[in-house]
A protein has these predicted regions:
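C-terminal helical subdomain
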Residues: 192, 213-298
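The beta1-alpha1 cofactor-binding region of Rossmann-like NAD(H)/NADP(H)-dependent oxidoreductases
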Residues: 43-47, 64-75, 107
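A glycine-rich helix->loop->beta "capping" turn
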Residues: 56-59, 71, 78-92, 98, ...
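Residue(s) in the substrate-gating loop at a strand-loop-helix junction
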Residues: 152
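Canonical Rossmann dinucleotide-binding motif of NAD(H)/NADP(H)-dependent dehydrogenases/reductases
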Residues: 1-25
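Substrate-binding pocket helix/loop in short-chain dehydrogenase/reductase
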Residues: 101-102, 109-114
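Active-site helix of classical SDR
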Residues: 125, 168, 176
Length: 298
């Protein structure tokens, strides 16, 4: 469980521990933008989550490796195999943000966001997939592995001021589809979630939407823990028949996203002349549904 020291990752790790999972709680303990954290408790966020899981009767160990460093990712996988002698699921959740309007975006900011989100998903999943492939070949049976990736509404629809984040999260959807197609032969599933919840990433950008309810007993739709039962189910044997899917979840609403679908199509059976393109595009758009709006636009 990567990025498990706070927010969604913390909630997922605790939920998994509650259901008997042996959890590797990975977190670097950094600030929201990826800079060094300022923890003063003497314990890292990962260690605090481990303590919470074990206090509730679960089993967990902390790991502080960088998900986007290939050898660091290898140590994350090795931690599970050394401590628990098995690897059943990988939940990729670690991320950072460097919000900036596209025209002002810096090269280093872009690289940092893409590195942690997209490369981080690649590194950990790639090494897990290698383990499961070898296990399936050795035993002659499906490995039963589970990959749960974390995309976002920004990756599905785009989000103003978050070009790098949106691009990374869209890339994660593409990665998930390929993982599902390629790893099915080894009995491994891959799915992605696009959650909306109150975290360090969202409560500053979408403060009003993420606010906790004002009345006691009112359903807190944006509580991170609302997302975690979906993650736990996707990690379980019950989800064996579900792969290559993206699930949007916020509060009590769960949606299967339909992905890119062909809308209007025109095939004239020959090369288009340039004068025909504009007329055809106008006609196709006219009979295609309007796209959902980008986050941050009216």
């Amino acid at each position: 469980m990567t990025g498990a020291g706070r927010g969604l990752g913390r909630a997922h790790a605790i939920e998994l521990g509650r259901h008997g999972a042996l959890v590797v709680v990975n977190d670097l303990g950094v600030a929201l933008d990826g800079s060094p954290g300022d923890e003063t408790s003497g314990h890292s966020p990962a260690e605090e989550v481990v303590a919470e899981i074990t206090a509730a009767g679960g089993c967990a160990v902390a790991n502080h490796d960088d998900v986007a460093d290939f050898e660091g990712a290898r140590r994350i996988i090795d931690t599970a195999l050394h401590e628990f002698e098995r690897l059943d699921a990988v939940v990729n959740n670690a991320g950072v943000v460097r919000d900036r309007m596209f025209v002002n975006a810096g090269e280093d900011e872009w690289d940092t966001v893409i590195r942690v989100h997209l490369r981080g998903h690649f590194c950990v999943s790639r090494l897990a997939a290698e383990y499961w492939r070898d296990l399936a070949k050795r035993t002659g049976e499906g490995a039963g592995g589970r990959i749960v990736n974390t995309s976002s509404g920004a990756g599905l629809l785009g989000s103003v001021g978050q070009a790098a984040y949106s691009a990374a999260k869209a890339g994660i959807v593409g990665l998930t589809l390929v993982q599902a197609a390629e790893l099915a032969r080894y009995g491994v599933t891959a799915n992605a979630i696009a959650p909306s919840a109150r975290t360090r990433m969202t409560e500053t950008v979408f403060a009003a939407a993420m606010a906790a309810p004002g009345q006691p007993g009112e359903f807190d739709a944006m509580a991170p823990g609302n997302v975690s039962p979906l993650v736990a189910w996707l990690c379980s044997t019950d989800s064996a028949g579900v792969t290559g899917r993206v699930f949007e979840i916020d509060g009590g609403r769960l949606t299967v996203m339909d992905g890119w679908q062909r809308a209007g199509t025109s095939d004239i059976g020959r090369r288009y002349g340039i004068e025909e393109i504009g007329e055809t595009v106008t006609e196709l758009i006219g009979r295609s549904p309007d796209p959902l709006p980008v986050y941050g636009t009216s």
